[in-house]
């Protein structure tokens, strides 16, 4: 046998054929009509299961090594890159992150085992769903082998791939992933078939993006073939007379062709809008995995926030495809919080996510539009805060002006006769009517407070201190006639009894300390007791007797 006659094995030359669009549409329509009968029961079951499997953010915050505020962005980014490299289908990444959050709610995750945990979560999610999130596909035997479409072929990552991408055989081996899978299943009580966010966001026909892209290509081919046919038609009619050309322009077939072109353009625009909508929904679903604060909300609340963003920036009227809980409508505060979290997530989109979605139709313009909206919103908030601050300053200034004017009109002094405060002296402007003056002024000055002059009183203080203004009795009663001397002595004894020495009424009273004869305390004539703003330390009673 010659070498050329040796068979090299089976050579597959068959090509995948496109899945018939008519067949997929008929299957989807049948499924939609059948499922409507159980729509309420399905919606209620999804709400119960999603609430049951919701991660506990309070327990996740207690992770000693994997603090979510510091490590979530890095670990979710690694998990997303791992899902892209292993080519799992749409929705598996979100499901894997959900497994990781639920596991962190019950177990402590060590930092050197984080990649092992998230890799196992991705492997478990791919096997749970089979990568087939479409009614046409089957979990065991998905479409895609013979046909191209209606969605990508299901793929489960191999253990060798997970070992390679998670650090190599020096860190992990295949048996460690198998052991971790069993450990995660035991931790989650084998309750791994939980509702997905795709059940709220994506309709059954929106899961087969390939079908829409194929239909778009067919329309483009038909349009190109139509243009070629029109060019041939023009070349054939170039030999006609002018009258024949004019009749051809004014004839009905030409107008019918214009209507056909308009219909085709509208159909293309509608198809592009549908493809853009599907891409936006997938982008927001993947983006939500990075937003740790979204774990505080229910699944349907997150979906409402996503639809509010889609409707705002695409001018559409979209809503969840499952029923909302009865009597528990989302309040405006919750919707505002979710909206703000997602907007901030879009503005700060992870580079790895943008790198994958930048080729998708409508994603980059959407991100730029959201960034412009956020920038304008920040400017408005800054302007509003500035205006509010200006108003507060104006109100405060008017308030102080009114107080100043009312105080200057109602009373000439800020101090009343019953106050116990001693004002500081104004050195810059000498006043005859001051605390330190020796002349008696009947009327108070509008600048200096009204103080009482007094005679020399016998001090019975134990520490031989000077008599202060606050300890002196008022010579008048409520501004009326002067009181009698007996009454004054009674008042003095009553007020000065705390300064008396017990059982020593006949004790010798030391001499009073005199002010210095220089500086601002210099007095002429008879010495009178004046209250000063500075407390003078005087000699004690024992030293005065020596």
Swiss-Prot record:
<keyword id="KW-0131">Cell cycle</keyword>
<comment type="similarity">
    <text>Belongs to the cyclin family.</text>
</comment>
<dbReference type="GO" id="GO:1902806">
    <property type="term" value="P:regulation of cell cycle G1/S phase transition"/>
</dbReference>
<keyword id="KW-0195">Cyclin</keyword>
<dbReference type="Pfam" id="PF00134">
    <property type="entry name" value="Cyclin_N"/>
</dbReference>
<dbReference type="InterPro" id="IPR048258">
    <property type="entry name" value="Cyclins_cyclin-box"/>
</dbReference>
<keyword id="KW-0132">Cell division</keyword>
<dbReference type="GO" id="GO:0000082">
    <property type="term" value="P:G1/S transition of mitotic cell cycle"/>
</dbReference>
<dbReference type="InterPro" id="IPR013763">
    <property type="entry name" value="Cyclin-like_dom"/>
</dbReference>
<dbReference type="GO" id="GO:0000307">
    <property type="term" value="C:cyclin-dependent protein kinase holoenzyme complex"/>
</dbReference>
<dbReference type="GO" id="GO:0005737">
    <property type="term" value="C:cytoplasm"/>
</dbReference>
<comment type="function">
    <text>Essential for the control of the cell cycle at the G1/S (start) transition. Interacts with the CDC28 protein kinase to form MPF.</text>
</comment>
<dbReference type="InterPro" id="IPR036915">
    <property type="entry name" value="Cyclin-like_sf"/>
</dbReference>
<feature type="region of interest" description="Disordered">
    <location>
        <begin position="224"/>
        <end position="265"/>
    </location>
</feature>
<dbReference type="InterPro" id="IPR006671">
    <property type="entry name" value="Cyclin_N"/>
</dbReference>
<dbReference type="GO" id="GO:0051301">
    <property type="term" value="P:cell division"/>
</dbReference>
<dbReference type="GO" id="GO:0007089">
    <property type="term" value="P:traversing start control point of mitotic cell cycle"/>
</dbReference>
<protein>
    <recommendedName>
        <fullName>G1/S-specific cyclin CLN1</fullName>
    </recommendedName>
</protein>
<dbReference type="GO" id="GO:0005634">
    <property type="term" value="C:nucleus"/>
</dbReference>
<dbReference type="InterPro" id="IPR014399">
    <property type="entry name" value="Cyclin_CLN"/>
</dbReference>
<dbReference type="GO" id="GO:0016538">
    <property type="term" value="F:cyclin-dependent protein serine/threonine kinase regulator activity"/>
</dbReference>
